[in-house]
Regions:
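N-terminal capping/interface segment
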Residues: 1-15
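Active-site region of the double-stranded beta-helix
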Residues: 20-125, 145-150, 155-192
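Histidine-centered metal-chelating micro-motifs
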Residues: 111, 131-132, 136-141, 161
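Trp-centered recognition loops
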Residues: 128
Length: 192
């Protein structure tokens, strides 16, 4: 899909409440596609016996992967949990590791979990009306800790690419789970 003239100026609609765009290409991720990414795979299987919930979707414009352009779009991460672990995006490094990304939270609340190849981790809150800068060299994953969809606008260098494979093997070193006191970041048991 490439409906836009990327060597010219154009405008595109994005609904600021729900992140949808009539002109963007939508990709949906269901629990069945992500069940191995949650630490409690038994809880995931139990949910899948009843339904296959939509965990998140993103809307992008099909920007060519070339230097100098900016890819942008929206992510809608729905509320929910697998066991005690909150719904999350798959997360990724960029193929060009030295690429940063910016997320602007349009609605909802959550957390961005980040880690670099050396194992350093950080977590930052995602709050409506705030922009979050994800530094270069950091894999990043959004987590919805609220009761409503977490809606974010994102942008990054179009030639950066996505590396999902590195994360798919063991997941992130840290995960976000519900405790009596609220959302808590813990070590991922899969890294033990």
């Amino acid at each position: 899909m490439n409906r836009f003239q990327w060597d010219s100026s154009f405008s595109v609609d994005f609904n600021l409440q729900n992140g949808f765009s009539e002109k963007a290409e939508t990709t949906k991720r269901y629990l069945s596609q992500m069940k191995e990414m949650f630490y409690d795979t038994n809880a995931a299987e139990k949910i899948l016996e009843q339904e296959d919930p939509l965990v998140y979707e993103f809307h992008e414009l099909g920007c060519p992967m070339r230097e100098g352009d900016l890819a942008f779009g929206t992510t809608i991460l729905y509320p929910g949990k697998v066991g005690k672990e909150y719904f999350m995006t798959k997360g990724h490094f960029h193929t060009i590791l030295d690429t940063a990304e910016v997320y602007y939270t349009l609605d909802g609340e959550g957390c961005m979990i980040m880690e670099n190849p050396e194992g350093e981790t950080m977590e930052m809150p995602l709050k409506k009306g705030e922009a979050l800068y994800v530094p270069r060299r950091y894999a990043h994953r959004s987590v919805n800790t609220g009761d409503t969809p977490l809606v974010m606008f994102f942008t990054f260098a179009a030639n950066a690419g996505h590396d999902y494979g590195t994360i798919e093997t063991k997941g992130y070193r840290k995960i976000l789970v519900e405790k009596e006191c609220g959302p808590v970041v813990i070590d991922n048991p899969k890294w033990s």
